Amino acid sequence: MLKIAIDVMGADNGVTPIVQGVIQALKSRDFNAVIIGDEAQIAPLVPPYLQSRAQIVHCTDYIRMEESASAAAKRTQSSIFKTTELLKNGDVDALVSPGHSGATMSLATLKIGRIKGVSRPAICTTMPNTTDKPSIILDAGANTDCKPEYLVDFAIMGYEYAKNVIGFENPRVGLLSNGEEDNKGNELTKATFKLLKEFSFFKGNVEGRDIFNGSVDVIVCDGFSGNLVLKASEGVASAMSSVLKKDIKSCLCSMFGALFLRGVFKRLKKKMDHSEYGGAPLLGVQKVVIISHGSANARAIECAIYQALNAIESNICSKLSDAFANKPSSAQQ
């Protein structure tokens, strides 16, 4: 049975919602959980009938959000260090962490290692759109300064993830720019465009609106731009929800109308709720690593575990290795 390691320390809302998410996942899917954190806080939350499938690795130290990611390599008793060690040694099949994302990325890259041929690992974030399947955008924050060859690697990884894990038959890849024309963009995107033309999956430049209209399935950009897109999208979704709630409560007619539309609102909320998409895989390392939001609730952790299981079952790391082994030399600078 597959084993998933979950680092429950360092999240914004403490241990409880993280463990609750693990419990919900254990009820729904067949796997064993290895929970890394303070046993005194974790043990009372695990029901007796699940204790045989939930091993606890005691640990009280963790990397605080205000600390530098570079501190993680020296903190051998921290929760993320122990979690990464378990994955490195083959004691677990994947890890999920809502803690310090920089520390997770740093340790995963240093200890687990990159897939041969990958220039830089990238954070791959799922974005809702107007179609039945979500879009993905990468990099969403791992690499703020990029070279064209990094973005080419992101495109290859995004294509393979969209095809093998999300289930697109022929994923369409677009390069985020300030216009659709071939000559639009900055020096980075113009140079990247020339390299990506070698790939049949590349559909050209796309604009920010294309992330949400389903015209492409994979959006490639540097980590600085990707993180701005991600945070702006979260902000817009939150603002729209607040405005909608305020307007519904403003008069009796609106409240009655909302009652008739509650099924629509429920489906919309589920589609737009980032918790439903779990976490973000760190693509390009040799094993499955899922980075969750620091404010993740129980549902987000539950879905992040499902992400990890789906990634393992799809054999994504092996698929990425094969893709980079066959990467055309003309797509490299």
Swiss-Prot record:
Gene Ontology cellular-component annotations: cytoplasm
Function summary: Catalyzes the reversible formation of acyl-phosphate (acyl-PO(4)) from acyl-[acyl-carrier-protein] (acyl-ACP). This enzyme utilizes acyl-ACP as fatty acyl donor, but not acyl-CoA.
Organism encoding this protein: Helicobacter hepaticus (strain ATCC 51449 / 3B1)
Catalysed reaction, written as an equation: a fatty acyl-[ACP] + phosphate = an acyl phosphate + holo-[ACP]
Protein's name in the database: Phosphate acyltransferase
Predominant subcellular localization, coarse grouping: cytoplasm
UniProt GO molecular function: phosphate:acyl-[acyl carrier protein] acyltransferase activity
Family according to the record: Belongs to the PlsX family.
Assembly description: Homodimer. Probably interacts with PlsY.
GO biological process: fatty acid biosynthetic process; phospholipid biosynthetic process
PANTHER family from the UniProt entry: FATTY ACID/PHOSPHOLIPID SYNTHESIS PROTEIN PLSX, PHOSPHATE ACYLTRANSFERASE
Compartments in which it is found: Cytoplasm
InterPro entries reported in the protein's UniProt record: FA_synthesis, Phospholipid_synth_PlsX-like
Pathway: Lipid metabolism; phospholipid metabolism
